[in-house]
Regions:
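Hydrophobic, aromatic-enriched alpha-helical segments typical of multi-pass transmembrane helices
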Residues: 1-237, 241-245
Length: 246
């Protein structure tokens, strides 16, 4: 029971961190797009106007993205034995997404921006998220596609309680929007982009919020069971001590 409570605590805390991270990255990205308010032209034009503040969303992502693995692991541990196959699928997809996203964020944070700060522009255009045709932008899109696809498998993993049913509905909608997300990777279209924005910036944080509530409820139930078992042991030991006196 104690192990289960610890798992739910980790899952609950990890969901909260993911929510804060995803919302922070989204807000900062939107703010930077409004501040810059210009389309990508070339690396020389970008170099004249670039600011180190632009890398903040990627710094946050680089630090916090691995937390999704804690959430996936907590989901796996909370499942019944016959449902744990889907938990493994979620962990696999989360691991793939984490590796890809960490690579994309690392390229800009640890390679591109230090080069720009040193006055080197050659070769950096493919390592900047500001360039819509860069390698890191493609990796980021692929990473979030895999991440949202992986968490859409919670539809198969969870049970039939009211909270779990709501989570499953969010998961299946997110899975459907992933088709638009996938098309957005290959085709630059406003409708497809809307699907990716809804999936990553709205439904994924919402799913994390509901999963956090799910872990919180599990944690409360588990603590009540622990307390009940402890009370039963106290009564049992008291009874044994009482009869031992005779």
């Amino acid at each position: 029971m104690k192990q289960g409570t610890d798992v739910y605590k980790i899952g609950y805390s990890s969901c909260n961190i993911c929510i804060i991270s995803l919302i922070s990255v989204s807000i900062l990205s939107v703010c930077m797009s409004f501040i810059k308010n210009q389309e990508w032209k070339d690396i020389d034009t970008y170099f004249v106007n670039f600011s180190n503040f632009e890398v903040m969303p990627e710094v946050i992502g680089l630090i916090t993205i691995p937390i999704v693995l804690f959430v996936a692991s907590a989901i796996y541990c909370s499942l019944d034995y016959e449902k744990r196959f889907w938990g493994i699928i979620i962990i696999i997809f989360s691991t793939m997404a984490t590796v890809i996203l960490e690579l994309s964020y690392f390229c800009e944070v640890a390679i591109a921006f230090p080069m720009l700060n040193s006055g080197i522009t050659k070769g950096t255009e493919m390592l900047l998220f500001a360039n819509p045709n860069s390698v890191v932008r493609a990796l980021k899109n692929l990473g979030y596609f895999i991440l949202t696809l992986g968490y859409s498998f919670t539809f198969f993993a969870l049970g039939k309680s009211r909270m779990e049913s709501v989570i499953k509905k969010i998961a299946i909608v997110m899975g459907g929007l992933n088709f638009l997300f996938l098309l957005n990777i290959f085709i630059n279209n406003s409708l497809f982009k809307l699907g990716s924005v809804l999936s990553c910036n709205f439904l994924l944080p919402l799913l994390m919020l509901l999963l956090g509530y799910y872990f919180r409820n599990k944690m409360i139930v588990n603590k009540r069971l622990e307390k009940k078992q402890l009370d039963n042991r106290i009564v049992e030991n008291t009874t044994k001590s009482y009869y031992a006196d005779f």
